Amino acid sequence: MHIGVAATPDVAIPTLDWLISSEHKVDLVITQPDKPAGRGRALKQSVVGEWATARDIPVLKPVTSDELIGKINDLDCVVTIGYGVLLPQHILDLPKFGFINLHFSLLPAYRGAAPAQRALQNGEVTTGVSVFQLEKGMDTGPIYAQRTVS
């Protein structure tokens, strides 16, 4: 399969490493635009952007979701991991199999950002991960797999 990955934080790196070692081809990485960092406030790309650049994988840093049109249409799917942007349905429908998300909670619990942190703050002793089809809502769509972690 030809896949894209939409991710920003370093928590995505182990999954990216696994994907490039699999039989699938990572054709494109989508990440957040560069942001000011450090004392000099110089623009710095995300950890995921650095990871992709080091492996000669094309990186796209769209400011608007419509910048993805024409860039992801030929992909079989896009895997998202902490990308941080709610995408409209017309974008989610572009790849052949849509967007598949890896989310760090047992959905429907803890939809949205920082689910593992919120579970810990609430004293949960069991949480997990979910793999599901992205739809236009916040972490909605059919769940394909879940794994519990205690």
Language-model-derived ranges and their functions:
Residues 1-150:
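One-carbon transfer enzymes
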